[in-house]
A protein has these predicted regions:
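ATP/NTP phosphate-donor binding region
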Residues: 1-27, 37, 41, 260, ...
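Catalytic core of DAGKc-family lipid kinases
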Residues: 6, 45-49, 53-157
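N-terminal glycine-rich "phosphate-gripper" loop used for MgATP/nucleotide binding
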Residues: 29-33
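Glycine-rich phosphate/pyrophosphate-binding beta-alpha loops
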Residues: 101, 105, 156-169, 235
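Gly/Ser/Thr-rich active-site loops/lids in small-molecule metabolic enzymes
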Residues: 114-122, 171-192
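A generic structural signal for short beta-strands and their flanking turns/coil linkers
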Residues: 135-137, 151-153, 176-181, 215-219
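ATP/nucleoside-binding phosphotransfer catalytic cores, i.e., glycine-rich phosphate-binding loops
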Residues: 143, 174, 184-278
Length: 278
């Protein structure tokens, strides 16, 4: 086993890509959705498998794939798991594996990443603070042969069902179906917002009158000006035209066997167990 501590997002990408070119069988990403993104990008359309040991804040991809959040159990799942092929998404020139989005979620992601403090409490604190002063944006949406204008609170492009922390923005999203779920959260009365938000955690938000979901392979969004985006929890700025497409069967990922009993850490490979004791 080769252990490599990444020093930057580019180092993570370049290192995983190098390992794939050297035909390593598995590359293990230890981190949150952002770290997983950086490493998985280097494995696109290669035979090298991605494995995940989740130690991030939201761990949206790991939760969607039912990868244990305990690192010992996650390692056991790697040693005794199945391999599946998952899709990726592309928002202009950026790759994502979990979700990407515009509007309020991008604003919160930017504030959260700049705060230096992690955790669900910090995230929710920014949500409350920013909601008071946030104004919906106007978008032109082209999807499924339709073109229409929409005022929206946020727009999420979901490859998997949740943002992280079991907040399900699109509970029925399938990470291997060759499609993306485009979720348009429309203008919502302030009095209704707590109830709609709660539906994220009950996996019922897809039934809300304030959300429209479109399943597609590509979508084009035009907004009034450049602005923030988020992709797998990372922040960025893009122009007024946003093109989002699905990349089918982009990465091979090791996931737990559905029929496996509860995973026990006693089976952890000695090299990895020793590594975690450091």
């Amino acid at each position: 086993a080769v252990f490599h501590t990444t020093t930057s997002s580019e180092d993570a990408y370049e290192s995983s890509h190098k390992f794939a070119q050297q035909q390593y069988d598995i590359v293990v990403a230890i981190g949150g959705d952002g770290t997983v993104n950086q490493i998985a990008r280097g494995l696109l359309y290669t035979k090298t498998k991605l494995a995940v040991i989740p130690v991030g804040s939201g761990n949206g991809l790991a939760r969607h794939l039912r990868i244990p959040l305990s690192y010992h159990s996650a390692v056991d799942a790697i040693l005794d798991g199945n391999t599946i092929s998952i899709d990726a998404g592309k928002i202009n020139d950026r790759i994502f594996f979990c979700t990407a989005g515009l509007g309020f979620e991008a604003v919160i992601g930017d504030k959260f990443n700049s705060s230096g403090t992690r955790g669900l409490f910090t995230y929710m604190k920014f949500c409350v603070k920013e909601y008071v002063k946030y104004r919906n944006e106007k978008y032109q949406i082209e999807v499924g042969g339709r073109r229409f204008n929409q005022d929206a609170f946020l727009i999420t492009f979901a490859n998997c069902g949740q943002w992280g922390n079991n907040a399900f923005i699109s509970p029925t999203a399938d990470i291997s179906d060759g499609m993306l779920d485009v979720v348009v959260w429309k203008k919502t009365p302030a009095v209704s917002m707590p109830f709609v938000t709660a539906e994220l955690f009950f996996k019922t938000i897809q039934h809300s009158e304030y959300l429209d979901t479109y399943r597609c392979k590509e979508v084009k969004i035009t907004r009034e000006k450049q602005g923030l985006i988020q992709y797998d929890g990372e922040s960025g700025v893009m122009g007024d035209e946003i093109n989002v497409t699905v990349l089918e069967h982009a990465v091979n990922v090791i996931v737990p066997k559905v029929s496996s009993p509860s995973l026990q850490s006693k089976h952890v490979a000695p090299q990895l167990k020793d590594f975690f004791k450091k």
